[in-house]
């Protein structure tokens, strides 16, 4: 107070004011401090000081033609003195006010296009719903979140090329637009921004917001998709939260969500096929999400989720170095260990071979609904500090940590045999056996763990075996905390390898991920996932397998037909028939296959018995490894709609129905496409059909020249003879009939004569 009085006193003397306004500041250190570098050292002071001047703004000379010298109140809007050091005009803030009221209005058509992200945000907020505010302790944990809704997923480099091409097309510099998305966006934006008068720099900034994913490491409790993050400041404080329902979705969140679902489906499906890695790659390459190739999305999208990371590893992309166990992401924060195989006995005296981690290590564990800090030594849990949304989530984290610790009391708590299998019916590895066992029922585990007295520590409570909190006692080494554990913040990615069973390892050989870690949660994708791979037909159940298998045969009929006659073994091994096998009762698969293959062989041997519909109908059954038996079948069973349904070997059935008149095939009542039979096949065998109007004279006769194809026969004159190539590469001598009347009888006699001629 005293100093202020003193200063006021000084300022009231005219001499002080004179000294302060006229004396030069010539202390070099001060001048250096405030003038070196372009960075403003005291922005708020600078702003206040500038705004106190009469003309704090400079503008281009053109302003003198666009803004009057004085406004209606007679105040000067710009100075006739030009700005020192440039040929610009010094302008008063009042000129801005005048312009806002009276300045010319430009064409606004480009504003919503350039500032699209802002306009969209306003719409989302307008249609969003804010609910009540609740006061409660917020367990926030820092997670890496997307803060920029509505963006494409281009890399910074790709985006830079697009922006340069759109905004500064005439600038020098090599720009290579390669990816599908780059080309589409460039074309779209050039179109939208034609004749745009908004400053190019501003357009470039706004384009960057639209094209690139921006992430921040922020404390979050609740939704992490970008449309929730944009209102984070409105929905959660230190001790309160406000309910909010967004007023619209954005494509980037939809892509992230659909990518996770697609990746999970693929990994689950690949795990049960003969060569999981090859199948997984085939599916990733043939699948589209919302019209974009899945492999392109995987290359650009930084989503970290177990299934997504397995797909990335298979494609040779780098992934995060953290590993996954029991649905939690583990990141080692200190310590180290060596691995050693050890045999242990369960409470049921079953021997398990486990890889023991020897050494002291600390980990953070981050799951969807709980997080923890784990300190462990060799086969011993030293301390576990958990926080989670509810009792259930906390219990899940405790079970995972107890199993991960490999403590003896955990292994001894096993009751009964461990024989869990994966989707491919293979036994799980011992650690996952233990995990599954205790996830089903952890009562014995918690009871046997042991209890200790605890000291009261701020923000921490004990937890008893029945999951009730306590301030006196707790399960040994385990505490529940009010504070969450932050997710691992680094975006560092490491090179990994993947084996054919989809186990992902880092360069030291530690397993980071395996199909067992992929969540079984089912969800509905927000963007259409197009599975063009036959492996994914069963995603939508048995009916889909049936329809897709037959549709595939019809679509590829030309190639299938040739393979059927020339290389059946290769045809039977096609992966497109693999899903179908799951519909055929296991016990009889081999017999069906043997029966159908024999039938097909007879068709090949006996001319004139080729039957398109029947081949298509029975072909999928021939794909199973055949068992030779003398059994004959008049119908074959497939398991669809919860029961066995019959496909008739000869004739139509509800499962497979071919309408000769309309040429349409219906499978289970659903249209499966048009089936074009070979010409005239319907009335008789293919050979006799094409030999109508010809008389078969006998075996090939070289005097009549090289064998013609059936199509070349039409050029023969009546009574002319020729050798003809028929059916399975056999050649016979024919003569074109002189009369048309007897054509009908040819069909019957041709078949007999061909056989005689060949034999």
From Swiss-Prot:
UniProt-listed Gene3D superfamilies: Polymerase Basic Protein 2, C-terminal domain
SUPFAM superfamilies, sorted: PB2 C-terminal domain-like (SSF160453)
Motif residue range(s): Nuclear localization signal: 736-739
Annotated site (Mammalian adaptation): 627
One GO BP annotation of this record: symbiont-mediated suppression of host gene expression
Subcellular location: Virion; Host nucleus; Host mitochondrion
Superkingdom of origin organism: Viruses
Keyword annotations from UniProtKB, A to Z: Cap snatching, Eukaryotic host gene expression shutoff by virus, Eukaryotic host transcription shutoff by virus, Host gene expression shutoff by virus, Host mitochondrion, Host nucleus, Host-virus interaction, Inhibition of host innate immune response by virus, Inhibition of host MAVS by virus, Inhibition of host RLR pathway by virus, Inhibition of host RNA polymerase II by virus, mRNA capping, mRNA processing, Viral immunoevasion, Viral transcription, Virion
Keyword presence, Metal-binding: no
Family designation: Belongs to the influenza viruses PB2 family.
Free-text function comment from the UniProt entry: Plays an essential role in transcription initiation and cap-stealing mechanism, in which cellular capped pre-mRNAs are used to generate primers for viral transcription. Recognizes and binds the 7-methylguanosine-containing cap of the target pre-RNA which is subsequently cleaved after 10-13 nucleotides by the viral protein PA. Plays a role in the initiation of the viral genome replication and modulates the activity of the ribonucleoprotein (RNP) complex.
Protein name listed in UniProt: Polymerase basic protein 2
Organismal lineage: Viruses, Riboviria, Orthornavirae, Negarnaviricota, Polyploviricotina
């Amino acid at each position: 107070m005293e100093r202020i009085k003193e200063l006021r006193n000084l300022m009231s003397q005219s001499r002080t004011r004179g000294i302060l306004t006229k004396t030069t500041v010539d202390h070099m250190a001060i001048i250096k401090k405030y003038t070196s570098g372009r960075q403003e050292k005291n922005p708020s002071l600078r702003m206040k000081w500038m705004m106190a001047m009469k003309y704090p703004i400079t503008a281009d000379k053109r302003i003198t033609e666009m803004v009057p010298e004085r406004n209606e109140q007679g105040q000067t809007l710009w100075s006739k003195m030009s700005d020192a050091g440039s040929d610009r005009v010094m302008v008063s803030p009042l000129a801005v006010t005048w312009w806002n009221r009276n300045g010319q209005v430009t064409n606004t058509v480009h504003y919503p296009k350039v500032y699209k992200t802002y306009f969209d945000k306003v719409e989302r907020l307008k249609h969003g719903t804010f609910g009540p505010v609740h006061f409660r302790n917020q367990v926030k944990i820092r997670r890496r979140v997307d803060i920029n809704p509505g963006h494409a997923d281009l890399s910074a480099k790709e985006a830079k090329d697009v922006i340069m091409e759109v905004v500064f097309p005439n600038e020098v510099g090599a720009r290579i637009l390669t990816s599908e998305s780059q080309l589409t966006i460039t074309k779209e934006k050039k179109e939208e921004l034609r004749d745009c008068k908004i400053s190019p720099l501003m357009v470039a900034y706004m384009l960057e917001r639209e094209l690139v994913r921006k992430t921040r490491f922020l404390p979050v409790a609740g939704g992490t998709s970008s449309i929730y993050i944009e209102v984070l400041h409105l929905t959660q404080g230190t001790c309160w939260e406000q309910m909010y329902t967004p007023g619209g979705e954005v494509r980037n969140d939809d892509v992230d969500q659909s990518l996770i679902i697609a990746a999970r489906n693929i990994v689950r499906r690949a795990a049960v096929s003969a060569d999981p890695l090859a199948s997984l790659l085939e599916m990733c390459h043939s699948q589209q999400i919302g019209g974009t190739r899945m492999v392109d999305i995987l290359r650009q999208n930084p989503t970290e989720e177990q299934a997504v990371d397995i797909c990335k590893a298979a494609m040779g992309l780098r992934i995060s170095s953290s590993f996954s166990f029991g649905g939690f992401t583990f990141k080692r924060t200190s310590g180290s260990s060596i691995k050693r195989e050890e045999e242990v006995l369960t409470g049921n005296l079953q021997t398990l071979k486990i890889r023991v981690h020897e050494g002291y290590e600390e980990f953070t564990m981050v799951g969807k609904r709980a997080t923890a800090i784990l300190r462990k030594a060799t086969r011993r849990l030293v301390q576990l500090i958990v926080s989670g949304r509810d009792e259930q989530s906390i219990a899940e984290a405790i079970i995972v940590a107890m199993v991960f610790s490999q403590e003896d009391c955990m292994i001894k708590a096993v009751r009964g045999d461990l024989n869990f299998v994966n989707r491919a019916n293979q036994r799980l590895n011992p650690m996952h056996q233990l995990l599954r066992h205790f996830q089903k029922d952890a009562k014995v585990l918690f009871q046997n763990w042991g209890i200790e007295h605890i000291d009261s520590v701020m923000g921490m409570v004990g937890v008893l075996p029945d999951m009730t909190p306590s301030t006196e006692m707790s399960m040994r080494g385990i505490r529940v905390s009010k504070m969450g554990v932050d997710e691992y913040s680094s975006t560092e990615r490491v090179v990994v390898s993947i084996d054919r069973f989809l186990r992902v390892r880092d360069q030291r050989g530690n397993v980071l991920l395996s199909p067992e870690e992929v969540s079984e949660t089912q969800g509905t994708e927000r963007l259409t996932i197009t599975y063009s791979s036959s492996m994914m037909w069963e995603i939508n159940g048995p009916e889909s397998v049936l329809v897709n298998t037959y549709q595939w045969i019809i679509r590829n009929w030309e190639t299938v037909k040739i393979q059927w006659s020339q290389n059946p073994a290769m045809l039977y091994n096609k992966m497109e028939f693999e899903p179908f096998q799951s519909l055929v009762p296991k016990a009889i698969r081999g017999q069906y296959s043997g029966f159908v293959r024999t039938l097909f062989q007879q068709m090949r041997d006996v001319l004139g018995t080729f039957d398109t519909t029947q081949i298509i109908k029975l072909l999928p059954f021939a794909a199973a490894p055949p068992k030779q038996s003398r059994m004959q079948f008049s119908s074959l069973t497939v398991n669809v709609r919860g029961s066995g349904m019959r496909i008739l070997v000869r004739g139509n059935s509800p499962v497979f129905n071919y309408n000769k008149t309309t040429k349409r095939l219906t499978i289970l009542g659903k249209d499966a496409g048009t089936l074009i039979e070979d010409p005239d096949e319907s009335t008789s065998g293919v050979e006799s059909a094409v030999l109508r109007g010809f008389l078969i004279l006998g075996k090939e006769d070289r005097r009549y020249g090289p064998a013609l194809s059936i199509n070349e026969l039409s050029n023969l004159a009546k009574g002319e003879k020729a050798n003809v190539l028929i059916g399975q590469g056999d050649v016979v001598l024919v003569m074109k009939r002189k009369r048309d009347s007897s054509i009908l009888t040819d069909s019957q006699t041709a078949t007999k004569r061909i056989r005689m001629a060949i034999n």
